[in-house]
C-alpha cells in the first residue's frame, strides 16, 4: 500500500487578544485552497485537527476550545483605501465544517502585525519608529477595522507593558477601531436591531419568554438578564461548562434568537452556524473573584457580562462580543445599557470571567434610528511560532 506524503504550508501561529489561531497568506495556500470551497475547508479542518469525536484536537493545531480552533487567511487588499483583506474561519471542534459567518475580534488584533511582517502592507505606510495604521477589510462581514500597530526600528513591536485580563504576560498594546460595526455589508443580516426594538420578548422552548436585546454590531449577539435564567452574572467557566442542563439551555438560545434576527430561516440551519449569534447574560456591577483569583470590586466595573462561544462559556470575552457590549451600552434602553445604570454613555468597563475590559462606542440618532460610527478597544498580539504546518497530501 502506498501512502501519500505530507505537504508543508507556510504558516504562523499567533495569539491575538485572548485567542490563538493559525495565520496564512492566501498566496501560500495550495492552489485549490486559494478559493472558497470544500478544498479550503477540508485543509483548514485538517490543520486544526477537526472533526475530532474525542473533542481534543490532538492531531492538529487546535486546543479544543472556541478560543483556539481558529484560522485566518490574509492577502493584499483588493479594495480602495485598505491595506489587507482579512478572512476568518472558525473551525468546529467535533463537526466537519468551518463557520465563515462572523469575525474574530480578538484575532483582529493580530492581523495588522502579521500583515506588516508578511509584506502585505506597503512599506511607505510603515514608520521606522511609531505607530503604523493598518486599514483592514474584514471580508466575512464586509466591514473596516483600523489597527494601530506599534513599530520599533522598522519592525512590529510585540513586547510591552500592556496587560490584558485573560492573558498571563504583558505585551505591546494594539488599539482597534471597528468602523460602522452595525449589521453587515450592504445591510445583510439586518439593521443594528434586526427586530426594530432595543428589547424584545424572546420565546425559548423549555425556558419560557425572556427579555432580550438582539443586536448586530461587531457580531450578532443576544443579551439576556442573568437573573431571568437563574444566574448571578459572577459565574466562571466550570459553573456553566460542566452543567449539561445549562449547556442544553444555551444551545437553544442562539437558535431561536437567530430566527428572530433573520440570520436563519429555520432552526435546523443553526447546526451549521456555531459561531453566530453569540449569547450573553448581563447584570449590574457586583463583587466577584476572577478565574485567576483576582478580586474584582463592583466599584471597578459598570456591569458584569458572561458570554458563550460555540456553546461554552468563554474564559474571558470575545472581541466581537465586546464591540456588541460597547455598542449596546451606548444606546439607552438596551438590557446592557440598563445593567450599566442607564442613560447615555460612550464607554463602559465590564467584568468578565478573567477580569475587566473597557470598550468605547460613538452612538448617535439619525432620523430616529441609532447609528454607531465606531467602537474602540485595545488588545495585544504576539507571534508564538512561525514556519510550516504539515498535513497529509490527500487531506483536501
UniProtKB/Swiss-Prot annotation:
It catalyses: 2-methyl-trans-aconitate = 2-methyl-cis-aconitate. The active site is at 104 (proton donor/acceptor), 318 (proton donor/acceptor). InterPro entries: PrpF, PrpF-like. Transmembrane segments: none annotated. The modification Cysteine sulfinic acid (-SO2H) is found at residue 104. It comes from the Bacteria. One of its GO terms (biological process) is propionate catabolic process, 2-methylcitrate cycle. Could be involved in the catabolism of short chain fatty acids (SCFA) via the 2-methylcitrate cycle II (propionate degradation route), however it does not have a 2-methylcitrate dehydratase able to produce 2-methyl-trans-aconitate. This is 2-methyl-aconitate isomerase.
Amino acid at each position: 500500500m502506498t501512502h501519500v506524503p505530507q505537504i508543508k504550508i507556510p504558516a504562523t501561529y499567533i495569539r491575538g487578544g485572548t485567542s490563538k489561531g493559525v495565520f496564512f497568506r492566501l498566496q501560500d495556500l495550495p492552489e485549490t485552497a486559494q478559493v472558497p470551497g470544500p478544498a479550503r475547508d477540508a485543509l483548514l479542518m485538517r490543520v486544526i485537527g477537526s472533526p475530532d469525536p474525542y473533542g481534543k484536537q490532538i492531531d492538529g493545531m487546535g486546543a479544543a476550545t472556541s478560543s483556539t480552533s481558529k484560522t485566518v487567511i490574509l492577502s493584499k487588499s483588493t479594495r480602495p483605501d485598505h491595506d489587507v483583506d482579512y478572512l476568518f474561519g472558525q473551525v468546529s471542534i467535533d463537526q466537519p465544517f468551518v463557520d465563515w459567518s462572523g469575525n474574530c475580534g480578538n484575532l483582529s488584533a493580530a492581523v495588522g502585525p502579521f500583515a506588516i511582517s508578511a509584506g502585505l502592507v506597503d512599506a511607505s505606510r510603515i514608520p521606522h519608529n511609531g505607530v503604523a495604521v493598518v486599514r483592514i477589510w474584514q471580508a466575512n462581514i464586509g466591514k473596516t477595522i483600523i489597527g494601530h500597530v506599534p513599530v520599533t526600528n522598522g519592525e512590529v513591536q510585540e513586547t510591552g507593558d500592556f496587560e490584558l485580563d485573560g492573558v498571563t504576560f504583558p505585551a505591546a498594546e494594539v488599539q482597534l477601531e471597528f468602523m460602522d460595526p452595525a449589521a453587515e455589508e450592504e445591510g445583510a443580516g439586518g439593521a443594528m436591531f434586526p427586530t426594530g426594538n432595543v428589547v424584545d420578548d424572546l420565546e425559548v422552548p423549555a425556558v419560557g419568554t425572556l427579555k432580550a436585546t438582539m443586536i448586530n454590531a461587531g457580531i450578532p449577539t443576544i443579551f439576556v438578564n442573568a437573573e431571568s435564567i437563574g444566574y448571578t452574572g459572577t459565574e466562571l467557566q466550570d459553573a456553566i461548562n460542566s452543567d449539561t442542563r445549562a449547556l442544553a439551555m444555551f444551545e437553544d438560545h442562539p437558535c431561536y434568537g437567530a430566527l428572530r434576527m433573520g440570520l436563519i430561516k429555520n432552526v435546523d440551519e443553526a447546526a451549521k452556524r456555531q459561531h453566530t449569534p453569540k449569547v450573553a447574560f448581563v447584570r449590574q456591577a457586583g463583587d466577584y473573584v476572577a478565574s485567576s483569583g483576582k478580586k474584582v470590586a463592583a466599584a471597578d466595573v459598570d456591569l458584569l457580562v458572561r458570554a458563550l462561544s460555540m456553546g461554552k462559556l468563554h474564559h474571558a470575552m470575545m472581541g466581537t462580543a465586546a464591540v456588541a457590549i460597547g455598542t449596546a451600552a451606548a444606546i439607552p434602553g438596551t438590557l446592557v445599557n440598563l445593567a450599566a445604570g442607564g442613560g447615555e454613555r460612550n464607554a463602559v468597563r465590564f467584568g468578565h470571567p478573567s477580569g475587566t475590559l473597557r470598550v468605547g462606542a460613538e452612538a448617535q440618532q439619525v432620523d430616529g434610528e441609532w447609528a454607531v460610527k465606531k467602537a474602540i478597544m485595545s488588545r495585544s498580539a504576539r507571534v508564538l511560532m512561525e514556519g510550516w504546518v504539515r498535513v497529509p497530501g490527500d487531506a483536501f
